[in-house]
Amino acid sequence: MSKKTRVPEVADDCTKTVYPDPIPMPTCPQLINDGTSCFLNIILQMLKRANFHDHFKGDWQKGKQKMLMHKELQQIFNGKPGPKDVSRLREMFSNEALKDGPHPLLVALKCLIKMSAVSDNDVIKEKGARDKMFQKQSDESNKMFAEHFIKTLLACKGMTKIRTMDIFRLIHICKKIFTVQKSMVEIDGPVRICGDLHGQYPDLIRLFAQGGFPPDSNYLFLGDYVDRGSFNLEVILLCLAYKARYPNNFMMLRGNHEVIHINEKYGFKDEVFNRKGEYHDELYPEFNEMMDMMPLVALVGGRILCMHGGLSQHIKSLDDLRNLRRPFHSEDECLENDIMWSDPAKVSGWTANPRGASVQFGENEVKEMCKLLDIDLIVRGHQVVQDGYEFFAGKKLVTVFSAPHYMQSFTNSAAVCKVSAGLEVSFEVLKPEDIRVEEIKCSAESSCASDMQQ
């Protein structure tokens, strides 16, 4: 067998159908970032297997240009590969000088890309047909699907292996779960309460790594999974997958960015279009229809009230929160809108909110609401706070924010509010500079825990 025909079997079988088309180097963000080193190491093994150097000296000796490329490849593989190396490889393998023969490396590389690519040929664009197919799946089948989805997303460190049809199915599953659950979910401790994430997927993974991936820990998220960050799809999909797999241990509330007239302006719509453009017109509305059905409030142990935004003067009892409307138009002035938009502030009474939506409320309003509802603490998100958490109204309300170094322009830490089975409250703080974790427990004299024991 000559050197020219000495090719890996997997490549040899595909030569006629795959080569000599231009080599489409992957362009997904994950491959250009975290997956770069792994991918280039695979190519390096192919180089060795295909005896690349011999080909350059023998059958492929066609000038100084190829020899220079060979040296450049060696420099790439001998060093630490980076995003620029991927760009250079893409440029090399699309070079006209390398298209005139079935070189084993190029064929094997093309086959690798073809085998690793995600096929979206099975997408059913018509919503009714999709829903009809998904409705046939059992709850057990859906949980198995969600578990596989989680493993795929985590193993690939991103969406490189996620099919569009699987995203449609996950949305369908979670919409069904949210619809069945009440507008105010009532749960017990222990639970870890997380604030805004805003598309910061690496930080979400750090939160799980520190506190335990589900189901090792129970979680309650306060909303704002998307917008302003770089990995909105990864964040919302991982959270939805955990929700589908552990519907009673992983709770998700709706934030003001889970609203179509907000997330169409602040990044989520653009990301869906840029990364799933062919199916954007179907996928983006599906996301928002599902978000419309998310619960708005949670009550932990009957004593800790949680929501994304804050309070409303329309709240007269816990039954008002149990009966919140879903879906609703968030542009309206209503109780549901206040739950997602209102803010605590150093004001007296209920005043107009500078955001242009909902209201602000003062310390007295917080204390009176706690007495009215017979609760000990209000936990909410919605605002960046420097230390990741910040108390208000004599520790009757706390703001929790879980996106450190927010938008890469703030120096804030992130925090998680930990509630024990006995409703004792403590906080884990993730520092942005080195992702150090500190645990702050409320002291016996001035703690939330002491308030809850009254």
UniProtKB/Swiss-Prot annotation:
Binds 2 manganese ions per subunit. Mn(2+) 2 binds at D224, N256, H308, H382. It comes from the Eukaryota. One of its GO terms (biological process) is defense response to Gram-negative bacterium. Its cofactor is Mn(2+). GO terms for cellular component: cytoplasm; nucleus. SUPFAM superfamilies: Metallo-dependent phosphatases. Keywords: Hydrolase, Manganese, Metal-binding, Protein phosphatase. Its EC number is 3.1.3.16. PANTHER family: SERINE/THREONINE PROTEIN PHOSPHATASE, SERINE_THREONINE-PROTEIN PHOSPHATASE C23G10.1. This is Serine/threonine-protein phosphatase C23G10.1. It comes from Caenorhabditis elegans.
